[in-house]
Amino acid sequence: MHVAVVINPISGARGRPGVARRRAELAAAVLTAEGVQHAVQVTERAGHAYELARQAVAEGATLVFAWGGDGTVNEVGCALAFGSTALGIIPAGSGNGLARELHVPREPVQALKGALLAAEQVIDAGEIGGRLFFNAAGIGFDALIAARFNSRTHGRRGLWRYCTVAARELFTYEAREYTIAVNGETGYHRALLIALANSRQYGNGMVIASQAQLHDGALDLVVVEGRSPLAILWEARRLFMNTLPSAKGVIMKKAQHLTVCAEAPLLFHVDGEPVVGGRSLTARVHPGALRIRRPA
């Protein structure tokens, strides 16, 4: 086995010195003790995790760990998708959506050792606007919150920060008109957000699509229609209660392929990373596109 570890020194450690060195030393020590051939790399910029993972694949890695948050996992996953190299996760972000869905331990040594011993599995990948995602994507309000949340370059970025940003933006955000073509039907919606879920949750235990499965060959489309800010805030508690399907103005469907159109360019996110797209976005699922290893 040849293992590579790609470390994001910023994830979960903004402003703390020496994090990259400590994480690299820990990973190297664990893999050396396990007798595993390895390479440990630290990212230096956005997009670097993808480059390092591609390099690891070219050098014969059979397992590449992403040590970071959802964005780091997305970059490494994109580098490994449709190939024979498996993804391992050492969660260190603010949401850790895919890691939570896979029940990956937060403790780095447990995550490392557990994945080394685990059997490989495959999960689906989603695609929207030409960008792959493995946990969730979204259009509208949740994409705006992702952009606002990620613009914070220092300090803590946990659940409280996310909820604070969302609550503040909710009172000025206007729902938009969308045309959604899915499963041979076309619908028109004035929506707060349109989520595409590969897994059940955004992260931090916020369940957006309770019926989603990582290996069912489908995406879960969730449309949250526009309502008053106070009504949305009241219903938002259901994200933490796993009861969102019971909320008024929430539409859910399984889909393999869909198109979303609007009159203005669409802001969307892939695994929490915001992207500005055109006025039409096509989304699809790629069944079994990514190999993973997770602790049993």
Regions found by a protein language model. Name each.
Residues 10, 33-34, 43, 81-86, ...:
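Catalytic core of DAGKc-family lipid kinases
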Residues 71-85:
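Short Gly/Thr/Asp-enriched flexible loops that form oxyanion-binding sites at enzyme active sites
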Residues 138, 142, 195-209, 274:
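Glycine-rich phosphate/pyrophosphate-binding beta-alpha loops
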Residues 182, 188, 213, 223-296:
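ATP/nucleoside-binding phosphotransfer catalytic cores, i.e., glycine-rich phosphate-binding loops
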Residues 1-64, 74:
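ATP/NTP phosphate-donor binding region
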Residues 151-161, 205, 210-231:
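Gly/Ser/Thr-rich active-site loops/lids in small-molecule metabolic enzymes
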Residues 49, 70, 194:
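Short conserved active-site loop signatures built around small residues
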Residues 7-9, 68, 225, 262:
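Short beta-strand/turn micro-motifs composed of small residues
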